[in-house]
């Protein structure tokens, strides 16, 4: 346990060092290239750095607090993300009981089952039980106008914001031989690799981006940015093998999988935003829009990462 805490502290301090360096670079760029705030690229970069400071502090404190801190943090994230998602849906008064059940019954039960390490139930609770419960509650109100669209939106919200997101702290429940009491480092690995991929795709795209991947969905995403960001994040993931139960090659392969899932997850969530006619999911995090804007890549990659690790490395 002491080794795990020591590795975690080393990792957190390293991230703080990187953020300090990034903040200094951002300050210099602001003074030289955007003293009046007119350079959108520089201002966007500094907004991202400020948001990263806030997120890293919260995540770092949760990690150091242990299992309870991590589960509470992601339960809060699920609640906030679910609120953002539901705000953009077509729900009506007839759906209020279903929504109340989603927030105050389904979400708490999912995280309680995770806390109790009941994999057999929490792995199917939302996609089976909650999936069937939501339309039952709504149909009892008797309003059938746009019923399929309304209930599908609620089901999608639960799948993304609760089910997928809960697979991040679910990594704490895995029983990996020789890796006891170190599972929090798996979460650190997942979040760092996926989030760095997002940042590096942005940087590579700004420096070398020419060919847009999906102009209507996300104009800032380019082939060059995608390739450079994914490749860089994969190499960084391989270099972080020492905090995982993986070999460098395995860490690199898993990093490639989760960065690809994160990228496509971002595209899917961008498509939903465009369908709703909005630029961001919310304004909770300055410089990053809503919580979903920041975590979309993580929640898409988390279930894949969890099940790959559980199948190949875990005893349970």
Regions picked out by a protein language model, each given a short descriptive name:
Residues 250, 295, 314-315:
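Short, conserved aromatic-histidine micro-motifs
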Residues 294-311:
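Final/C-terminal transmembrane alpha-helix of multipass membrane proteins
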Residues 276-297:
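Interfacial loop-to-transmembrane junctions
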Residues 175, 308-316:
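Juxtamembrane boundary at the C-terminal end of a transmembrane helix
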Residues 2-260:
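Membrane-embedded alpha-helical bundles of polytopic integral membrane proteins
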Residues 205-209, 273-276, 299, 303-304:
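Re-entrant/interfacial helical elements at transmembrane boundaries that shape
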